[in-house]
Amino acid sequence: MNSHASNGRSRNWPHALLESALLTSALLMASSVALANAPAVPEAPKALVKELHQAKTYTITSPPTGPLEMAKPVLPDLSGYTTEAALKKIARNKPGKITVARMMEETGLKEFIGGDNKMAEWVVRQKGIPQAIMISDGYVNLQDLVKKVPKQFLSEVSPGVYVARLPILVKETGIFEIDSKTKELRLSQEKGSFIVSEGKMLITNTSVNAWSETRNGLAAYRTPDEFRPFVLTWGGSQTWIAKTKMASMGYNQSKSYGVSISQYTPNTAKVLKRGEPTGWIIDSEFADMWYGFYCYETRDFVVKGNTYRDNIVYGIDPHDRSHGLIIAENDVYGTKKKHGIIISREVDNSFIFRNKSHNNKLSGVVLDRNSVGNIVAYNEIYQNHTDGITLYESGNNLLWGNRVIANRRHGIRVRNSVNIKLYENVAMANGLMGVYGHIKDLNDTDRDIELDPFDAQVSLIMVGGELSSNGSGPLSIDSPLSVELYRVSMLMPTKEVGISLNGILGERQDEILDLLVRQKKAVLIDPVESQTELRE
């Protein structure tokens, strides 16, 4: 574990953006602090929101600063996650068994052929009873497969380039390797090829792509529901992908998103009782995927040093009850529909650090649906089309040392989340607020409240860092349970009115800034009445 976290990655900020932001900051610092009489109001969605009770009276005090001081977070050591280390993860001494067998007899393939007339899809694609290539009872590499599988199902079309025209299943006892001897493995879109692993799979120094034989090119995204080949690993599996390029995989179908690491479906998991899947994806590139990365009930997975570019829905999307994840040093950009990086629904005790997430359709980084105990540190989040970092209904998280710059809406947005610690973050040149905290009643929305409960409460501690040149102001927090501020550098927004604190902070702005800026003390803002008391 690293006791001293550093942020030594190069920052390829657009030159004009940095020049403008730094010049503006210098001018603002020279201007000193000016207090505004007319605070700006940030935009906030109003549809489907119940009117919540607003506390009318807050106390402003200056607590001791000692409890607010915190050591830098200890981040995982990444030095062991290398291609060389991955190559040592599997045993190659026992040759495995290769067969071509019916899909419907295999637990690992039931998701794709059972119910809803799914079988018919594969009958049409294969023009017969659906079959798959099976690997079991030992080690097999792609060249072994080519030697034993009929050429109509798997063939070499040019030196080192192979086309698979059936699904490939790595069974629980199987070990499958694709390495540098393979220049490219093409999974046929028309024939319905894909890869599923219940065992061990190692993919290094190669390319694996979804391929349209009809168009003689990548199976480029056209519509959400058009089948595109994918890679999926199930419960108990171990997967390592390193120095590999993957493109044009996945579509809008369960477990078929692109590269997915998932526990079995609940009913199957109860029967098989296999552990959570795990593994690494490192130093690789993913483009035009439905999801660049997805996981479900996965443990200790490492996503490090990858490029996720121009993917469709999400770049990186760990989901339901995954934990102990490391998402580090990735470059995520150009996501077309939603967020660059999102963890959602009880994704806990994980690390998101030293990533770049930029130019995504919505937010750069999102913590969502009761994801707690996470550390988000030293990330560079810029030029996203909504917020930089967004926390939805996810308390007890630490954001440390992030640079959140030139996002179109808020720099950091915190909704219905308590005990959020914001330490040493820079939010600069964002379209609305530098930091925006608010509550929202979700009962009248399409949210499943039993599955994803929430409390309409927000509280945060903000220590150090800088909020400067944000379009609507440095900071706005509506109806908080509490707010603590200390050593926060707040420079003027782009508007000429000077510093303007919004929400309840604006009502006591003079007192807050006197303590925080002039006296350099900590500030604690507490409501006299709690939400419970107000409702009663």
Curated annotation (Swiss-Prot):
Signal peptide interval: 1-36
Keywords: Alginate biosynthesis, Isomerase, Periplasm, Repeat, Signal
Coiled-coil spans in chain: none
Effect of residue 314 to F: Retains 5% of epimerase activity
Compartment(s) of residence: Periplasm
Enzyme class: isomerase
Pathway assignment: Glycan biosynthesis; alginate biosynthesis
Name of this protein: Mannuronan C5-epimerase
Species per Swiss-Prot/TrEMBL record: Pseudomonas syringae pv. tomato (strain ATCC BAA-871 / DC3000)
Gene (UniProt): algG
